[in-house]
C-alpha cells in the first residue's frame, strides 16, 4: 500500500513539474498606459505585459510613438451561426485621433479581416495602433454580457496574437522594453 501511495505521489509531482516547465515564460514584452473607460476623472495606470498573458502594475515609462485609428462601429457585423457568433467585416472605415476619415493601408485591412475571423464575440470597439510606424497592435473591446473585455493583440504574420486582457479600459500608449 505504501509503495502504491509513493508511486502516485511521485507521479503527481512529475505532472506538477511538467506543468510548470511547459508554462509560458513570464518575460516582460511591453508597457502600456491604461485608463478606466467608465470614469472620466480616473487616473491612468501603467502596467507591464508579460509573454504569459499576465500584466502587472509598473512605474511610469516613456511611451513609443503611437498612432491610433478607430474603426467605425458599423465595420463589423455580428450574427449567430449555430452555437457561436460570427463576425463579418462589412466595411473598412477608419478614423484618426481627431475624427477624420483615413484610408487604411493593406496591413490595417488585413488586421480587420483577421479580427473578424479570429474573434468569436461581437466587436464593440476596434482600434489599430501603429507603434513607431512599424509594429501593428489592435485593442478590441467586446460586447459580452456582464463585463467589457478589452484585449490587446499584436498583428504579425497575418494573425492577431493575444497579449493581455483587461475589463473596461482605454489604451493610452505603448512602450517597448
Where are the regions that the model predicts?
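Positively charged n-region of N-terminal signal peptides that target proteins for export
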Residues: 1-4
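Hydrophobic membrane-insertion alpha-helices, especially the h-region
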Residues: 7-19
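Sec-dependent signal peptide cleavage junction
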Residues: 18-28
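Short beta-strand elements that form the blades of beta-propeller/WD-repeat-like
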Residues: 33, 41-52, 56-60, 67, ...
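Structural motif
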Residues: 55, 63-68, 146-152
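Surface-exposed loop and turn segments in beta-propeller and other repeat-based domains
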Residues: 82-117, 169-176
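Short loop/turn segments that connect beta-strands within beta-propeller blades
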Residues: 156-158
Amino acid at each position: 500500500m505504501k509503495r502504491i501511495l509513493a508511486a502516485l505521489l511521485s507521479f503527481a509531482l512529475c505532472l506538477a513539474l511538467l506543468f510548470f516547465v511547459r508554462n509560458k515564460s513570464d518575460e516582460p514584452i511591453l508597457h502600456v498606459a491604461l485608463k478606466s473607460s467608465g470614469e472620466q476623472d480616473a487616473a491612468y495606470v501603467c502596467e507591464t505585459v508579460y509573454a504569459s498573458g499576465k500584466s502587472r502594475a509598473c512605474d511610469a515609462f516613456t511611451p513609443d510613438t503611437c498612432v491610433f485609428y478607430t474603426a467605425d462601429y458599423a465595420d463589423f457585423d455580428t450574427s449567430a451561426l449555430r452555437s457561436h457568433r460570427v463576425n463579418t467585416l462589412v466595411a473598412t472605415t477608419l478614423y484618426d485621433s481627431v475624427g477624420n476619415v483615413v484610408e487604411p493601408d493593406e496591413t490595417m485591412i488585413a488586421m480587420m479581416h483577421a479580427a473578424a475571423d479570429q474573434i468569436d464575440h461581437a466587436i464593440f470597439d476596434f482600434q489599430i495602433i501603429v507603434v513607431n510606424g512599424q509594429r501593428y497592435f489592435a485593442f478590441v473591446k467586446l460586447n459580452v454580457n456582464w463585463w467589457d473585455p478589452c484585449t490587446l493583440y499584436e498583428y504579425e504574420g497575418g494573425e492577431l496574437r493575444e497579449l493581455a486582457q483587461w475589463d473596461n479600459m482605454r489604451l493610452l500608449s505603448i512602450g517597448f522594453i
